[in-house]
Amino acid sequence: MIVSSTTDFREAARRRLPRFLFDYIDGGAYAERTMARNIDDLADIALRQRVLMDVSVVDPSTTLFGVRQALPVALAPVGLTGMYARRGECQAARAAAAKGVPFCLSTVSVCDVDEVRAASATPFWFQLYVLRDRGFMRDLLARASAAGATTLVFTVDMPVPGARYRDAHSGMSGPNAAARRLVQAALKPAWAWDVGVMGHPHRLGNVAPALGKASGLQDFMGWLAANFDPSIQWSDLKWIRDAWKGPLVIKGVLDPEDAKAAADIGADGVVVSNHGGRQLDGVLSSARALPAIADAVGDRLTVLADGGVRSGLDVVRMLALGARGVLIGRAYAYALAARGEAGVTQLLDLIDKEMRVAMALTGVRDVASINETILAERVPRAG
């Protein structure tokens, strides 16, 4: 199969993975309209083509949180990545390190912080959820820091899990889920051998101490649902700011007032995100929410964004809307599931090439020059 875009990686992932895993990557909340709008609203952003601008040298590199990187891109925290490919977090981290972009490890990863650091020998970002057990959170922060995590991405848009109907239909949850998953795995023998057999252990590495012997998928889902903390407030983040000495990024912000609150508690950045449309269906797409947030706090925080990014062209669009950098989640998960580390490497190379083409054809030579002036029309601010 020829792979030349994220769409191709998605199809290859669909063919390889059991349905419950593919739908877990591919699905969203409720009717999945916000998930679709993430893609559609970003694709509708028209760029202003310029000519005769001397774009003989185009440089897509940038600096985020004091670190120079090859692209204004980071691999977003994606849960259960080690189930998409054998020790998937390690494969993705190696690909990111080789390209010179950050990899962000999810709290709910198969490979833990120490295994990822050993695999890539490069500092990484770490993502943390809001959990009831503050002692466990403190221990996890300490482990991540000791393993070399430099930037903490604190996810705040999951006080409760979203309603993901597709998961119930596919066997990730719902009646007889375990039996349905076994049948689906048997129908995908290449995945079953490579990941199901050779990819052990399948425990959730970072939360294994809390789970104890109960480390199966259903155990994990139940533990996570029971440990989300809906009572947390902005004032509760002070101890996280005090505990984490590196850059702190608040992920899951869609409103300028929340972005201002993040700045007020001492955060270094925010991620404009609706969790890939996996939490509350009907909220703004990231592309629509981004400009107002960039206007409100762009001089106080590093504004990042995710949601609907499928190409280097989409990265340029997000930067033009006000982001300093972009997190890529589903796109790299598809690539990883399809071809492992080589797939993620190929995806990042595609994004690099697509960014360079888009920059050249809009007349910009460096990332700092990408702003609203390359848009064909002024984008209205939400709110």
From Swiss-Prot:
Substrate binds at residues 24, 129, 164, 278. Residues 1-380 form the FMN hydroxy acid dehydrogenase domain. PROSITE patterns: FMN_HYDROXY_ACID_DH_1, FMN_HYDROXY_ACID_DH_2. FMN binds at residues 106, 127, 155, 251, 306-330. Pfam families: FMN_dh. Its cofactor is FMN. GO terms for cellular component: plasma membrane. It is a peripheral membrane protein. Its main location: membrane. Catalyzes the conversion of L-lactate to pyruvate. Is coupled to the respiratory chain. The active site is at residue 275. Its EC number is 1.1.-.-. It comes from Caulobacter vibrioides (strain NA1000 / CB15N) (Caulobacter crescentus). Belongs to the FMN-dependent alpha-hydroxy acid dehydrogenase family. GO terms for biological process: aerobic respiration; lactate metabolic process. The lineage of its organism: Bacteria, Pseudomonadati, Pseudomonadota, Alphaproteobacteria, Caulobacterales. It catalyses: (S)-lactate + A = pyruvate + AH2. This is L-lactate dehydrogenase. It comes from the Bacteria. Keywords: Cell inner membrane, Cell membrane, Flavoprotein, FMN, Membrane, Oxidoreductase. One of its GO terms (molecular function) is FMN binding. It is found in: Cell inner membrane.
